[in-house]
Amino acid sequence: GSIPKFIEEYHIDNGIIYGCVKNHVPFVLTGSIRDDGPLPEVYANAYEGASAMRELVRKSTTVICLATMLHTIATGNMTPSFRVMPDGTIRPVYLYAVDAAEFVVNKLLDRGSLSATTMVTNVQDFIGKVAGGLGLI
């Protein structure tokens, strides 16, 4: 099994992971010690997952963290503030964190992710507003 196969077999046609798969947007899913039998694409080993996250954020131009405190803080800690593009230009890496808990977004900023833009709101509302703004709903 795989996430793309699951999406196809169960006729999934919406959601964040669906959107990433459909539009070929790379993502990293890491499990926790409590996970029981993660999906094939989920890194069960925390060190391997962190390495995959680090590799992906180094290639990113925009990172959006949604409602997972430990993953958000870890991602913020490993996200560079800029990226050198193949043509030599330097551009910023935009880091956004959305969580309903003010503690989470403050912790991200307290840990040194100074270039992060944080929003304290319900992730479902955030996604709805973004989708509406993009004319998707």
What residue ranges belong to the model's regions?
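C-terminal functional extensions of proteins
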Residues: 1-63, 68-137
